[in-house]
């Protein structure tokens, strides 16, 4: 594979004319993908909001497909995988857990413990992980998702890994920095790291109020890091006037606006997102939306969407087409048969709809 020809094809697949920084990043990605087999090489792409990271990734995936090169898309959560797939032209995307772990059998399933690693049977594949800043180095069971991901990818012949994220996003719980986006951490795991950062705003996003304020907050974060101890850094002020994608809403109008968003036939519940400053406020808004907008007064109701928080392996008969329930999957409640309290906890007997495998 000629890296210059490959880079030209990626740039052609972009829906706009790339800026100089994007051209340089595409050239680096092309060299990475076109290089002859080398042991354990990883590419880390850090992209600020609005810099064209999503479009660039989609163009890369389409170019790999056109060249008959296998691209495997993954993300930490079901929602992130769904968005990643949509932004990549409908190319299938998996949660990391679903791809790199396998179904446990017999005593292994009954014993629980760390998940069972799957076998990477791919050859010459490029694994692309979006939202990589969410990947933690260690969970409550002492399992490192990052270590397991790396081991899985590089157990396949001539497979390589591209990690895509934004270091300004919150790191995994218990971490000060995202280990997956930290070249020093990756080198400590024995990887040869190539890294690039997109900082220039794409022209088509320059008029976005969301992007404007995200950039302002990013600069404020840099000031906080550079402020000497004992001094108070300036508090950033958000700008809301003059943007088509930012609207100030009075509290009394919020229920009507939320109802309109959730009733939207095209987007609906799945794509309506409310961001709060704390988990407590999130719980309050969730309760209010369920009761006053969706009219769901029960603790758990038909249509509720749930996020799986831990891998589950079936010890008996498996549902058709489902090997195991993966951490990060989004499932939908189809029927609630009953609830009960045991050992100080509440349990529900429900029927769930699972995402396609």
Where are these regions (language model features)?
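Conserved SAM-binding loop
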Residues: 18, 73, 274
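ASCE P-loop NTPase helicase motor core
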Residues: 26-27, 31, 37-236
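N-terminal pre-Walker A segment at the start of P-loop NTPase domains
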Residues: 10-29
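Soluble or luminal CAZymes and related metallo-dependent hydrolases
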Residues: 21, 141, 145, 249-254
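Conserved adenine-nucleotide phosphate-binding loops and their immediately adjacent elements
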Residues: 2-16, 46
């Amino acid at each position: 594979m000629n890296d210059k020809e490959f880079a030209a094809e990626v740039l052609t697949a972009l829906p706009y004319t790339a800026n100089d920084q994007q051209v340089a990043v595409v050239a680096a990605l092309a060299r990475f993908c076109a290089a002859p087999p080398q042991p354990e090489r990883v590419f880390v792409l850090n992209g600020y909001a609005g810099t064209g990271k999503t479009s660039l990734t989609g163009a890369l995936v389409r170019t790999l497909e056109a060249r008959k090169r296998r691209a495997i898309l993954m993300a930490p959560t079901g929602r992130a995988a769904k968005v990643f797939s949509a932004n990549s032209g409908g190319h299938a995307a998996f949660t990391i857990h679903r791809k790199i772990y396998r179904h446990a059998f017999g005593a292994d399933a009954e014993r629980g413990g760390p998940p069972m690693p799957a076998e990477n049977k791919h050859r010459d594949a490029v694994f692309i992980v979006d939202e990589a800043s969410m990947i933690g180095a260690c969970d409550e069971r002492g399992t490192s998702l990052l270590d397991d991901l790396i081991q899985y990818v590089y157990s396949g012949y001539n497979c390589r890994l591209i990690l895509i994220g934004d270091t300004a996003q919150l790191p995994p719980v218990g971490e000060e920095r995202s280990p997956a986006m930290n070249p020093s951490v990756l080198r400590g795991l024995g990887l040869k790291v190539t890294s690039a950062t997109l900082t220039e705003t794409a022209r088509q996003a320059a008029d976005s109020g969301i992007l404007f304020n995200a950039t302002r907050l990013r600069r404020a974060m840099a000031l906080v890091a550079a402020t000497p101890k004992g001094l108070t850094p300036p508090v950033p002020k958000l700008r809301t006037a003059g943007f088509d994608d930012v609207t100030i809403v009075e509290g009394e109008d919020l229920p009507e606006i939320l109802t309109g968003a959730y009733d939207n036939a095209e987007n609906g519940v799945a794509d309506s997102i409310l961001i709060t400053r704390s988990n407590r406020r999130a719980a309050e808004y969730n309760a209010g939306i369920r009761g006053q907008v969706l009219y769901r007064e029960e603790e758990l109701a038909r249509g509720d969407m749930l996020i799986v928080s831990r891998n589950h392996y079936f010890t008996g008969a498996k549902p058709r087409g489902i090997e195991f329930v993966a951490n990060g999957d989004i499932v939908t409640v189809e029927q609630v048969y009953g609830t009960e309290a045991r050992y100080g906890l509440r349990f529900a007997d429900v029927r769930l709809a699972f995402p396609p495998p």
